[in-house]
């Protein structure tokens, strides 16, 4: 089974001293999407793209797919 991890996003936010509420505001996504990100649950590609715009990065810089055994 495969799962998604947003640990890279958490590190990027910490490195840029950005709180989740600030990211929600500038990337324009809902508290529901923020909760899903926090729980390592899938979110829409649109949300990921807006986050990438904020950090000027690629999707692979904010998340990764992990194979669970």
Where are these regions (language model features)?
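Key DNA-contact positions within bacterial/archaeal DNA-binding proteins
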Residues: 21, 32, 60
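Recognition helix of helix-turn-helix/homeodomain-like DNA-binding domains
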Residues: 28-43
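Short, basic-rich loop-to-helix N-cap that marks the start of a DNA-contacting helix
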Residues: 40-53
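Short C-terminal boundary/hinge segments that cap the last helix of small helical domains
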Residues: 56-69
